[in-house]
């Protein structure tokens, strides 16, 4: 008889909150990421950050730069750099499509969130994005404040 598998508890998705504020998101896609075992364990504990990270295409491969993964505390074999470059796993066709859009329109690749899918594999949601100007950021803040005030008025009545 087979044993019942215990449901694994994973950390909630790790979000890059600043990305939606600083960029206009045009298109999103999900990519796999190449990690070492100790890095996966560290991400499961929630010791990762996407702040100030970005993706770039180099020699036909997509690389994630500046993603911080704190080294796993029980790993004694090797010490890894916390902000090393990590390869994103996409099809050649998807990479080619991204590369043409980045080159012709001046867009950037920004990671939005890191999450574990239902099979327990770490995935990164990346987006083609265009940087916002300062007045766009101010407009976003104003619209958020107006929305918040509306919600407060709805609660009182």
UniProtKB/Swiss-Prot annotation:
Its main location: cytoplasm. One of its GO terms (molecular function) is RNA binding. Belongs to the SmpB family. It is found in: Cytoplasm. Transmembrane segments: none annotated. InterPro entries: SmpB, SsrA-bd_prot, SsrA-bd_prot_CS. It comes from Chlorobium phaeobacteroides (strain DSM 266 / SMG 266 / 2430). Required for rescue of stalled ribosomes mediated by trans-translation. Binds to transfer-messenger RNA (tmRNA), required for stable association of tmRNA with ribosomes. tmRNA and SmpB together mimic tRNA shape, replacing the anticodon stem-loop with SmpB. tmRNA is encoded by the ssrA gene; the 2 termini fold to resemble tRNA(Ala) and it encodes a 'tag peptide', a short internal open reading frame. During trans-translation Ala-aminoacylated tmRNA acts like a tRNA, entering the A-site of stalled ribosomes, displacing the stalled mRNA. Keywords: Cytoplasm, RNA-binding. This is SsrA-binding protein. SUPFAM superfamilies: Small protein B (SmpB) (SSF74982). Signal peptide: none annotated. The keyword tRNA processing does not apply. The lineage of its organism: Bacteria, Pseudomonadati, Chlorobiota, Chlorobiia, Chlorobiales. CDD domains: SmpB. The keyword Membrane does not apply. GO terms for cellular component: cytosol.
């Amino acid at each position: 008889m087979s044993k019942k598998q215990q449901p694994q508890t994973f950390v909630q998705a790790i979000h890059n909150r600043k990305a939606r504020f600083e960029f206009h998101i045009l298109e999103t896609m999900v990519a796999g990421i190449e990690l070492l075992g100790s890095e996966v364990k560290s991400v499961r504990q929630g010791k990762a950050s996407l702040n100030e990270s970005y993706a770039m295409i180099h020699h036909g491969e997509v690389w994630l730069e500046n993603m911080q993964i704190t080294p796993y505390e029980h790993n004694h074999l090797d010490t890894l750099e916390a902000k090393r470059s990590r390869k994103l796993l996409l099809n050649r066709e998807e990479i080619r499509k991204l590369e043409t859009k980045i080159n012709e329109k001046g867009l950037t690749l920004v990671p939005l969130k890191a999450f574990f899918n239902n099979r327990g594999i770490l995935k990164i949601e990346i987006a083609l994005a265009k940087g916002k100007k300062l007045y766009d950021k101010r407009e976003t803040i104003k619209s958020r404040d107006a929305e918040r005030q509306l919600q407060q008025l709805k609660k009182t009545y």
